[in-house]
Amino acid sequence: MKVYIETMGCAMNSRDSEHLLSELSKLDYKETSDPKAADLILINTCSVREKPERKLFSEIGQFAKIKKPNAKIGVCGCTASHMGADILKKAPSVSFVLGARNVSKISQVIHKEKAVEVAIDYDESAYAFEFFEKKAQIRSLLNISIGCDKKCAYCIVPHTRGKEISIPMDLILKEAEKLASNGTKELMLLGQNVNNYGARFSSEHAKVDFSDLLDKLSEIQGIERIRFTSPHPLHMNDAFLERFAKNPKVCKSIHMPLQSGSSTVLKMMRRGYSKEWFLNRVEKLKALVPEVGISTDIIVGFPNESDKDFEDTMEVLEKVRFDTLYSFIYSPRPFTEAGAWKERVPLEVSSSRLERLQNRHKEILEEKAKLEVGKTHVVLVENRREIDNQIVGFEGRSDTGKFIEVACKEKRNPGELVRVEIVSHSKGRLIATAKGD
């Protein structure tokens, strides 16, 4: 039996897809890259914005046309969680609907016609998924918590993934050890509020926090680097930042989702912090780790966002000079506080703001890239670069999250750590040579 999975959205969905494959492998399903050859087609969905949701029904229609006569189509993930049985009504070709909090039930629903399993109070935190040896992966994803307790006015995730529960540490460490034995060098820890780990478990558990978990994972032989996403700025207190700075295996790059640089808008968003508080955290972090790479999320056009509010966002962009920017126009979502508000920023205004934000960020990246020339970094090799079947170098990321293209005559294998020197840059790209090459 063959299964094809299309994954939309975030890294959490990518990991959920791996867990789906893990469960299906117990039933002798093998993954295929060809939906026409599949006996089961799964669409793992995203609902953070409206666009991926619209895409879902287009995808269902396309798969229904090309699938084998008896092949089943299943819709999984966040859109499945909040639309439930409505998906079956809109798309009769769908055989079942499986919510984001119900991954472990896949082996049950594939045997039921028109099954709907979307309960967000279902607890998978202590579910020991079989280790799925898909292939040796240099960088691997690892869930450490599920759900979200925050009440951000724009976000549907608490409605689709339920309450926040931490996965027991022993299960996390056991899976990390298996990943390391399979060749993983870098872990990416996943959670909706990943740095709030330990706040709540579903059963009795020793008191631990996120920094404790990072320390334990750092002890695993073979694991060279640890990253994590997505943290919440509210949980970046001094103690966390200090331990982040001291742990040599924790990469010195961090995601700090700003959302808006306006304290007024942040209050409307129910983010729990102000512009000044956010900047204070950045200042503290840069004092501890001057070379730190910082990425962020920014929403423009949130209801009632004024010109002054947007200028505040631009001011934070200038002060922090983020290394990576994920920016979007506000998208109203069902089951959210802001989704019910009638006030809307005109699309042409939001589009203009987004363009200005993104263009300035591109300029900042060029300015920062110039300053990198002559500096050295240690890069984890991810891919070899070839021209006409001849190895000309490799690609990888630095400890600070910078993607670097390296010219190198010597063969370097994925997973190796190599010291490189930046020699040039182009449109924000960093180009280097291997030291000693």
From Swiss-Prot:
Keywords: 4Fe-4S, Cytoplasm, Iron, Iron-sulfur, Metal-binding, S-adenosyl-L-methionine, Transferase, tRNA processing. The keyword Iron applies. It is found in: Cytoplasm. Residues 134-367 form the Radical SAM core domain. [4Fe-4S] cluster 2 binds at residues 148, 152, 155. It catalyses: N(6)-dimethylallyladenosine(37) in tRNA + (sulfur carrier)-SH + AH2 + 2 S-adenosyl-L-methionine = 2-methylsulfanyl-N(6)-dimethylallyladenosine(37) in tRNA + (sulfur carrier)-H + 5'-deoxyadenosine + L-methionine + A + S-adenosyl-L-homocysteine + 2 H(+). [4Fe-4S] cluster 1 binds at residues 10, 46, 78. Residues 370-436 form the TRAM domain. It comes from the Bacteria. Binds 2 [4Fe-4S] clusters. One cluster is coordinated with 3 cysteines and an exchangeable S-adenosyl-L-methionine. Its EC number is 2.8.4.3. Its cofactor is [4Fe-4S] cluster. Residues 1-115 form the MTTase N-terminal domain. GO terms for cellular component: cytosol. The keyword S-adenosyl-L-methionine applies. Gene3D superfamilies: Methylthiotransferase, N-terminal domain, tm_1862 like domain. GO terms for molecular function: 4 iron, 4 sulfur cluster binding; metal ion binding; N6-isopentenyladenosine methylthiotransferase activity. HAMAP family: tRNA_metthiotr_MiaB. Belongs to the methylthiotransferase family. MiaB subfamily. Catalyzes the methylthiolation of N6-(dimethylallyl)adenosine (i(6)A), leading to the formation of 2-methylthio-N6-(dimethylallyl)adenosine (ms(2)i(6)A) at position 37 in tRNAs that read codons beginning with uridine. Monomer. This is tRNA-2-methylthio-N(6)-dimethylallyladenosine synthase. It comes from Helicobacter pylori (strain Shi470). The gene is miaB.
